[in-house]
């Protein structure tokens, strides 16, 4: 994967973050989507979140069984309830789907197939399901999807379980499905370091989407947030609003 000072319309800027809070990412990717133009490159944001449950637009509070100390927020992505936490890689996809020539169904299929291709390269046989977006290994869910399309562009994206603690999943009905088993790469016998795993995943996703990945620096909103944290300021001061908590 290369880092370039210039881009073409079919380049995707890949930004690798450490652990980032959900609110900052959500509002930053929404802001990017609202202000992008037809010449702007697509972006992948690759990161982890601290523990959090998020309810999509179709989410029902009764699918949160026992949140305990883990925050629950309402999100504007599609889908039901999901969990994010350490040991899970999240890839947010800011894509111009008109430029890519994809409808919503084609987009979901391309993302799922990119994940399936990645898992196949590791010797893991995985499938998607018509009745439940995501990627599954012998019935257990290893990757989740949740997208928002606005102004011909997408944000939000996917999450794949690397080596995370699966116990928080028992506190919800994952994506609204009762007793849905979950799994991880590690449980499937794969023990890749995070950076290598993420680079490989991005490569397969970009190929399925017809994009060329170009590694890029972290964005200004993240650097500003880090400065606020370091100086004792409000890390959310650059955000327009906080998500609604349940």
Swiss-Prot record:
UniProt-listed Gene3D superfamilies: Bira Bifunctional Protein, Domain 2
Disulfide bonds: none
Enzyme class per UniProt: transferase
InterPro entries xrefs: aa-tRNA-synth_II/BPL/LPL, BPL_LPL_catalytic, Octanoyltransferase, Octanoyltransferase_CS
Domain BPL/LPL catalytic: 38-213
Catalytic activity from the UniProt record: octanoyl-[ACP] + L-lysyl-[protein] = N(6)-octanoyl-L-lysyl-[protein] + holo-[ACP] + H(+)
Any one GO CC term of the record: cytoplasm
GO biological-process terms attached to the record: protein modification process
Pathway: Protein modification; protein lipoylation via endogenous pathway; protein N(6)-(lipoyl)lysine from octanoyl-[acyl-carrier-protein]: step 1/2
EC number: 2.3.1.181
Misc: In the reaction, the free carboxyl group of octanoic acid is attached via an amide linkage to the epsilon-amino group of a specific lysine residue of lipoyl domains of lipoate-dependent enzymes.
Entry protein name: Octanoyltransferase
The gene coding this protein: lipB
């Amino acid at each position: 994967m290369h880092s370039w000072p210039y881009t073409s319309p079919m380049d995707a800027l890949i930004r690798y973050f450490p652990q980032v809070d959900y609110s900052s990412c959500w509002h930053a990717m929404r802001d990017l989507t609202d202000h992008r133009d037809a010449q702007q490159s697509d972006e992948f944001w690759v990161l982890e979140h601290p523990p959090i449950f998020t309810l999509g637009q179709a989410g029902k509070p009764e699918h949160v069984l026992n949140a305990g100390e883990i925050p629950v927020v309402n999100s504007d992505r599609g889908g039901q309830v999901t969990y994010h936490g350490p040991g899970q890689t999240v890839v947010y996809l800011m894509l111009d789907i008109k430029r890519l020539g994809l409808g919503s169904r084609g987009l979901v299929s391309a993302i799922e197939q990119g994940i399936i291709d990645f898992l196949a390269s590791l010797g893991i046989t995985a499938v998607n399901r018509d009745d439940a977006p995501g990627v599954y290994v012998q019935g257990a869910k290893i990757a989740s999807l949740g997208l928002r399309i606005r102004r011909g562009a997408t944000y939000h994206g996917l999450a794949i379980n690397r080596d995370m603690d699966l116990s928080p999943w028992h506190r919800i009905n994952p994506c609204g499905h009762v007793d849905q088993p979950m799994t991880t790469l590690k449980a499937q016998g794969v023990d890749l370091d995070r950076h290598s795993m993420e680079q490989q995943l991005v490569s397969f996703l970009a190929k399925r989407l017809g994009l060329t990945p170009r590694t890029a620096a972290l964005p200004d909103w993240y650097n500003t947030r880090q400065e606020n944290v370091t100086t004792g300021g409000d890390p959310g001061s650059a955000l327009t609003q906080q998500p609604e908590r349940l």
